[in-house]
C-alpha cells in the first residue's frame, strides 16, 4: 500500500542533473512532497532511467517508491 513506501529525497541543485539511488524496476515511483518552487514534471525534469531515480532543472522533491 501507499503508507509503507520507501522515501527518497532527490534534489537538483543549481539546475544540475542529479541521480538519487536505485529503485526496483517493478516499483512505482511518485512525488510525495515537492520541495522546490520549480514544478517537477515526470519525463521533463524527473524520472527513472533504468533503475536510477533522477532529477534535473531545479526539481527538488521527496519521492516514494513502492
Walk through the language-model features, giving the residues of each.
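Glycine- and aromatic-enriched low-complexity segments, predominantly in secreted/extracellular proteins
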Residues: 1-66
Amino acid at each position: 500500500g501507499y503508507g509503507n513506501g520507501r522515501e527518497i529525497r532527490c534534489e537538483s541543485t543549481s539546475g544540475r542533473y542529479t541521480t538519487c539511488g536505485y529503485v526496483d524496476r517493478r516499483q512505482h515511483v511518485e512525488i510525495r512532497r515537492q520541495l522546490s518552487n520549480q514544478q517537477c514534471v515526470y519525463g521533463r525534469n524527473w524520472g527513472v532511467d533504468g533503475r536510477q531515480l533522477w532529477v534535473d532543472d531545479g526539481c527538488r522533491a521527496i519521492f516514494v517508491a513502492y
